């Protein structure tokens, strides 16, 4: 697949500088791009690569255009432009292209137009698959689960029963949605399992990375709103709610009944306590331990930044003595006040 620069400019609302008839076949980095490639510059610290780049064209801002020695598409945000061009030139194969003979599909499953189901997939009774849904090899879709149009599951995804997924969703391999939440009562040391009777409701245009787990609700559904993106190896516990447009980076853990607002950004390996709320537009940096609600938009961090082992040992020793140091300081302050 190829587009001329003029065609790409029309798609992006960009301005062509150079030969608009040149064909672009793929995207590449500034350093590695060659003939037929388009690249981008979104950070001026990489501007020096422009002089040596062999790209056919560069996505660039008006401010950086004087430094560009080749053809260019000028637009406000080159990185967003790159993302859209990459979509147009995407050569990623589909999870499945037809219904494989080895797929096991219950008799009452409702299949939309052009549905594809890969080898050894299992689709149970009561499932509804919208138009252009793609189910990869080895997937399991449990009873009464619904997938909206154009949603895709890569190989070996598991959707338990009573899951609702909207349109244009993408789930990467190994992810499990709808397993039991961690719900138990304790009676004199004996754990009594609480059946998890809710489901999982996932909105439209949600993307979920590989090997992530999203538990079903205890009584009501776990909810993921529209336009949420979740990275690999995250744990979303029962009855968590994640608001519109929030991004969750890899290895994040969210305990039960956490409510995350709209447009939040959650850094990797963050840990959240349950039964609390995070307000809209909160940014939590990586490795944070969030034990209390966040009520004001802003950037939040916790943890000790990287040090040499020797420095870290000194810091740890001082932290262990902080209560003792506080008491000594208080005594000194009182003594000074008395004098």
Swiss-Prot record:
EC top class, as a word: transferase
Family matches, as Pfam families: Hexapep, LpxD
MF GO annotations: N-acyltransferase activity
One record GO biological process: lipid A biosynthetic process
Record's keyword annotation contains Lipid biosynthesis: yes
Superkingdom, taxonomy of origin: Bacteria
Family, as annotated: Belongs to the transferase hexapeptide repeat family. LpxD subfamily.
Protein name (Swiss-Prot/TrEMBL): UDP-3-O-acylglucosamine N-acyltransferase
Name of the gene: lpxD
């Amino acid at each position: 697949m190829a587009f001329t620069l003029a065609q790409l400019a029309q798609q992006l609302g960009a301005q062509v500088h150079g030969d608009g008839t040149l064909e672009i076949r793929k995207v590449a980095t500034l350093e590695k791009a060659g003939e037929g490639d388009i690249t981008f510059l979104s950070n001026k610290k990489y501007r020096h690569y422009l002089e040596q780049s062999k790209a056919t064209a560069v996505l660039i801002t008006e401010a950086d255009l004087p430094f560009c020695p080749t053809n260019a598409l000028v637009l406000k945000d080159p990185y967003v432009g790159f993302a859209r061009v990459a979509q147009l030139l995407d050569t990623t194969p589909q999870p499945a292209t037809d219904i494989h003979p080895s797929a096991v599909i219950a008799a009452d499953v409702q299949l939309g137009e052009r549905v594809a189901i890969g080898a050894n997939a299992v689709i149970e009774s009561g499932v509804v698959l919208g138009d252009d849904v793609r189910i990869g090899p080895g997937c399991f879709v449990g009873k009464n689960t619904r997938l909206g149009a154009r949603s895709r599951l890569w190989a070996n995804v598991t959707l338990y029963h009573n899951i609702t997924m909207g349109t244009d969703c993408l789930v990467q391999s190994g992810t499990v949605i709808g397993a039991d939440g961690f719900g138990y009562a304790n009676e004199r040391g004996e754990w009594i399992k609480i059946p998890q009777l809710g489901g999982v409701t996932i909105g439209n245009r949600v993307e979920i990375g590989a090997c992530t787990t999203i538990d079903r609700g205890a009584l009501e559904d776990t909810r993921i709103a529209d336009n949420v993106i979740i990275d690999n190896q995250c744990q979303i516990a029962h009855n968590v709610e994640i608001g519109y447009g929030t991004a969750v980076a890899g290895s994040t853990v969210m305990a039960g009944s956490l409510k995350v607002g709209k447009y939040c950004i959650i850094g990797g390996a963050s840990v959240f306590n349950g039964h609390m709320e995070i307000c809209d537009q909160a940014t939590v940096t990586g490795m944070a331990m969030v034990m209390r609600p966040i009520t004001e938009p802003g950037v939040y961090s916790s943890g000790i930044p990287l040090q040499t082992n020797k420095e870290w040992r000194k810091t740890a020793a001082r932290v262990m003595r902080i209560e003792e140091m506080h008491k000594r300081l208080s005594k000194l302050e009182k003594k000074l006040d008395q004098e």
